[in-house]
Regions:
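Substrate-binding pocket helix/loop in short-chain dehydrogenase/reductase
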Residues: 104-105, 109-117, 159, 214
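Residue(s) in the substrate-gating loop at a strand-loop-helix junction
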Residues: 148
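Canonical Rossmann dinucleotide-binding motif of NAD(H)/NADP(H)-dependent dehydrogenases/reductases
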Residues: 9-38
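Alpha-helical segment proximal to the catalytic Tyr-Lys
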Residues: 133, 179-183, 242
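C-terminal substrate-recognition "lid" of short-chain dehydrogenase/reductases
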Residues: 222-250
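The beta1-alpha1 cofactor-binding region of Rossmann-like NAD(H)/NADP(H)-dependent oxidoreductases
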Residues: 45-46, 67-78, 110, 227-228
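Active-site helix of classical SDR
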Residues: 128, 166, 174
């Protein structure tokens, strides 16, 4: 079997949180193109349904939509059970839901801080644990968490201390779970994208003025494209990465 065949995800089942648009939509599409059945998990159910239909029509795979608030433990636990029941199992997941609030630290409210931490860190913890428990009891699997380059550096010129802190914590959570579960068949890795030109970013009145500055600081002189994250996620979800855990891909 050649490397391209080994990279395929035929027979695998997985879900993507924040999967209705942006990075999550691209990776969900890639998983399905590689042969997996996928659940689009998002708090925006209407958009998740639209994305699920598009991917199913494009790939011929079974793609479902599930409305979930990833900060609600009961909803997350129910989502994992629904994925396993409707798709026939759970082999991988991409925990991608997240937000960013730009505000100077001294002006950021405690409510704003908590909102970012709750979605970006607590939401990934809840999803990791729910998916991890299923995988530990059912032969293993692969968990992919979306962190950020902001876990490694301080972005400028925009102030975003809560986002930076939350994403740094995601990487350490990823490593901790990877060590705990390594000998039990569950791998946990993270990706740390740079500036990615998602539809929301490219159409944001507050972010568009910053794009030229970001591009100037990038060695490639441009933002990344969401689809440029597809290959690493397909690799991590599949069986060619079985010796890879606790790693962060920047």
């Amino acid at each position: 079997m050649g490397i391209i065949e080994k990279m395929r995800l035929d027979g695998k089942k997985g879900f993507v949180t924040g999967g209705a648009r942006g990075i999550g939509k691209c990776t969900a599409t890639a998983f399905a193109e590689a042969g997996a059945d996928v659940a689009i998990v998002d708090i925006d159910f209407e958009e998740a349904q639209k994305t699920a239909r598009e991917i199913a029509e494009k790939t011929g795979r079974k793609v479902i939509a599930i409305k979930t608030d990833c900060t609600d433990k009961d909803q997350v636990d129910a989502m994992v059970k629904q994925v396993a029941a409707e798709l026939g199992g759970l082999n991988f997941c991409h925990n991608n839901a997240g937000i960013c609030i730009n505000a100077p630290a001294e002006e950021m409210t405690y409510e704003q801080w908590n909102k970012v931490i709750n979605i970006n860190l607590n939401g990934i913890f809840l999803t990791d644990i729910a998916a991890g428990k299923y995988m530990l009891e059912n032969g293993g699997g692969s968990i992919i968490n979306t962190a950020s380059m902001s876990a490694h550096i301080v972005n400028v010129p925009q102030p975003q201390c809560a986002y930076n802190a939350s994403k740094a914590a995601v990487i350490q959570l990823t490593k901790s779970l990877a060590v705990e579960w390594a000998k039990r068949g569950v791998r946990v890795n993270s990706i740390s994208p740079g500036y990615i030109g998602t539809e929301l970013t490219l159409n944001s009145p507050t972010l568009v003025p910053l794009i030229e500055k970001w591009n100037h600081m990038s060695p490639l002189g441009r933002m990344g494209k969401p689809e440029e994250l597809e290959a690493i996620c397909v690799y991590l979800a599949g069986d060619t990465s079985t010796f890879t855990t606790g790693s962060d891909f920047i």
